[in-house]
Curated annotation (Swiss-Prot):
Membrane topology: Multi-pass membrane protein
TM region(s), chain numbering: 37-59, 79-98, 110-132, 142-161
Keyword Lipoprotein: no
Protein's name according to its UniProt entry: Uncharacterized protein AF_1462
Length: 183
């Protein structure tokens, strides 16, 4: 389940207006709804990932769940520590997405904040998965790396394109629709 959720999360980069191949395939509102739905599903499963690592220990008889949890949070393994940090970033991303209209009056500021958090999240969690991925073969890890690289390119293109477009509109003396308070 975590493999599917991680893949869904990385694919969120491709369910944005920055990914030009999808833009012409349907109305943007449908793409945003799919982005939101897949985001909630993947975040929902991944927030329970630590519990799913610890709880089965109850039935194995070797180590108790609390001892397993304590071992995880007191480790010095950088990949596990980045997994914990990624969990906190993911929780922040989820909460700010749900409370977006209360926290941000300007849609562009929220979108930029959301994009930066998403890149931080995927970088941190990507390292965690590539180093610790028990269920991933070398081919699967290569697939993840390609998806991550494509996601980064999509984000860079989106924000570079937005900067160019904003400059073009400013030169014409016009205001972008995204600069208004409504999304």
């Amino acid at each position: 389940m975590t493999v599917l959720s991680f893949t869904l999360m990385v694919n969120q980069f491709y369910l944005t207006r920055g990914f030009r191949l999808i833009e012409g395939k349907g109305r943007m509102s449908y793409i945003v709804k799919a982005h939101r739905l897949f985001g909630y599903i993947s975040v929902g499963f991944l927030l329970f990932h630590p519990l799913l690592e610890v709880l089965p220990r109850q039935f194995e008889g070797s180590i108790q769940p609390f001892d397993a949890f304590w071992k995880i949070i007191t480790t010095d393994n950088s990949a596990i520590l980045l997994g914990i940090a990624g969990w906190a970033v993911m929780l922040t991303l989820a909460v700010t997405s749900v409370l977006r209209k209360r926290l941000f009056k300007n849609y562009r500021k929220w979108r930029t904040f959301h994009g930066i958090l998403a890149v931080v999240l995927i970088t941190v969690v990507g390292y965690h998965v590539l180093v610790l991925g028990r269920h991933s073969s070398l081919a699967m890890k290569a697939f993840y790396a390609v998806l991550l690289a494509g996601g980064y390119v999509t984000m860079i293109k989106t924000y570079v394109f937005d900067l160019r477009r904003e400059e073009k509109w400013k030169n014409r003396g016009l205001k972008l629709a995204e600069d208004s308070s409504s999304p």
